[in-house]
Structures are given as structure tokens and as C-alpha cells.
Amino acid sequence: MISMKKVNYAAIDIGSNAVRLLIKCVNEENAPELMSKVQLIRIPLRLGEDAFTVGVISTEKEKKLIRLMKAYKQLMKIYDVVDYRACATSAMRDARNGKDIVQQIVKKTGIRVEIIDGQEEAHIVYDNHIEQLFASGQNYLYVDVGGGSTEINLISNGELKNSRSYNIGTVRMLSGMVKEEEKEALRTDLIGLATEYTPISICLLYTSPS
């Protein structure tokens, strides 16, 4: 039997509702189908409650975030993580002090955080091999509803045809901070995609539980 070296990788998602750490084990051939989940931790900091209403993340929540990132760094050491990617999404994009907080995180924890735009966020959803979930020769609209934004990916015949992101999410909606023009843009785009790609199946993923 051939023994393959296994290594652990981590992903940190600083979202509008929660901050997640996912650690997965892969073999040396980096075959996605052989990946296995080692650990998943989700802590609800609700950064979007500040970012979407007052435009900044409070000092209290910034301190909690930094403490949490220190804990995540220790967990990555315990699990012998060889590499990681840390991304911040809608709340940190909107917060005026988002970039300053990222600088404090790297200064106090050594963890490098990227504030990614909505388009990159949508592509990351697709890069999670979601096309493998769907039958070839058909059209699918994959909708990922988060706390601060909603990403849609149009997949036709196993290929990504369109990716878009909208500032519509559960935390924004509960805070009453979703703009009417954003709702109209989503509605118009959905009608357009459904008209162009007929018939179409919709897969709805809700990634921002309370």
C-alpha cells in the first residue's frame, strides 16, 4: 500500500455575522475528493451590526476579533497547519476602520487578512467545486445568502457563466440597511438570467445562521 503524506490547511472567514475557522486535511496529490474536515469553529461576533448601521466596527468588537484571531492562530499551530487563507467580507468592506483593523490583526497575531470584494467572494463560492453537485447539460443558479451580501453563480453545462454579488444579507435586512436599488438590481438580474438560461434550477444556500 502506498502511503501518502497528509497535510492540514486552514481557512478563516471574517463575515458579517460570524468568524469561522475551517481546517481540512489533504493528501500530497491535493485531490479535492480526498479532503477531509478536521475542525470547524464558528463564533458569532456580528460585526455587521456595527458596520452597516454606524459605518465603523466598535472598539469592543475589534478587541474581541483580535482575541479570537489569536485563539485561531493557536489552533492552527496545534493542528500543524502548513498554510492558510484569511478573508474578510462585507462588514469589513463597509467599515471605515476595516483596513485599520486588518493592520492591527497582523501586528498582534501575525495573521494576514485580505478584505475581498464581492466578485472575489462569489468566485470563492464557485471554487469550492460546487459544479460537482449538479448534473451536466443543465442550468443552475447557485445562491449563497450571507449576513452582509448575497452571491450568485450561474452554472450551465458544468461551466461557470456568471458570478455576481449584492449588498443584501440577513444582518443588513435586520438592520434595515438594504437599499431599494440593490433589491431592484438583484431582481432584474435574476429575471434576466432566468430568461437567458431556460429551464433553470435554483440552489439556495444560507450561510449566516443566527
For every predicted segment, state its role.
Residues K5, D117-L141:
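Conserved phosphate-binding catalytic cores of ATP/NTP-utilizing and phosphoryl-transfer enzymes
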Residues K5-N30, G137-N162:
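Gly/Thr-rich phosphate-binding beta-strand-loop-beta motif of the actin/hexokinase/Hsp70
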Residues V19-I57, S156-E182:
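Short glycine-rich, Thr/Ser-proximal phosphate-binding strand/loop in the N-terminal lobe
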Residues Q39-V82:
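Phosphate-binding loop and its immediate beta->loop->alpha context
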Residues A95-D100:
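Metal-dependent catalytic neighborhoods of phosphoester/phosphodiester hydrolases
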Residues G176-L204:
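ATP/pyrophosphate-binding catalytic subdomain of soluble kinases
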Residues Y206-S210:
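Conserved small/polar residues in nucleotide/adenosyl-binding loops
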